[in-house]
Amino acid sequence: MRVVVQRAKHAKVTVNGEVVGSIDHGLVLLVGVTHSDTVEDAAFIADKIAHLRIFEDESGKMNLSVLDVGGEILSVSQFTLYGDCRKGRRPNFMEAAKPDRALPIYEAMNEALRQKGIRVETGKFGAMMEVELINDGPVTLIVESKEKAGNK
């Protein structure tokens, strides 16, 4: 799995003119799933994101997690994170998992975050979406499950 994590003051996702998810203070996740990903990858990613210390404490240091600050998460599926632009001018998306494989893993990650007590809003899987956010910092990170112990 590959997740772009953005700290946000506010965010919303719209599908066909209707807001389907919105948060205040928290994180926006752009989530990509590849063929080899499993629910174990989803659990790893959820735990990593829930405990990432990327919110400032009273001293202005990034020492607090989304859990610590009572933040929310807006999770948006994004297969284009596995786009390969090394050859030609059109990205190749062969590394992105097909929807029937990606959806259960994406949902498992969201559920694992909810189980930690985080309010999680989502976009609509597979839909064309408009994502609007106010970046806070900005703080933007990439988290990948291939980095967990034992993966190559």
From Swiss-Prot:
Name listed for the protein in its UniProt record: D-aminoacyl-tRNA deacylase
Domain notes: A Gly-cisPro motif from one monomer fits into the active site of the other monomer to allow specific chiral rejection of L-amino acids.
Short sequence motif Gly-cisPro motif, important for rejection of L-amino acids: positions: 137-138
Catalytic function, reaction form: glycyl-tRNA(Ala) + H2O = tRNA(Ala) + glycine + H(+); a D-aminoacyl-tRNA + H2O = a tRNA + a D-alpha-amino acid + H(+)
EC number in record: 3.1.1.96
Family: Belongs to the DTD family.
Sequence intervals crossing the membrane: none
Gene transcribed to yield this protein: dtd
Protein role: An aminoacyl-tRNA editing enzyme that deacylates mischarged D-aminoacyl-tRNAs. Also deacylates mischarged glycyl-tRNA(Ala), protecting cells against glycine mischarging by AlaRS. Acts via tRNA-based rather than protein-based catalysis; rejects L-amino acids rather than detecting D-amino acids in the active site. By recycling D-aminoacyl-tRNA to D-amino acids and free tRNA molecules, this enzyme counteracts the toxicity associated with the formation of D-aminoacyl-tRNA entities in vivo and helps enforce protein L-homochirality.
GO molecular function: D-tyrosyl-tRNA(Tyr) deacylase activity; Gly-tRNA(Ala) deacylase activity; Ser(Gly)-tRNA(Ala) hydrolase activity; tRNA binding
One of the GO biological process terms: D-amino acid catabolic process
Stored InterPro entries: Daa-tRNA_deacyls_DTD (IPR003732), DTD-like_sf (IPR023509)
A Pfam family hit: Tyr_Deacylase
Leading EC class: hydrolase
Localization (cell): Cytoplasm
Assembly notes: Homodimer.
Gene Ontology cellular component list: cytoplasm
Keyword hit for Ribonucleoprotein: no
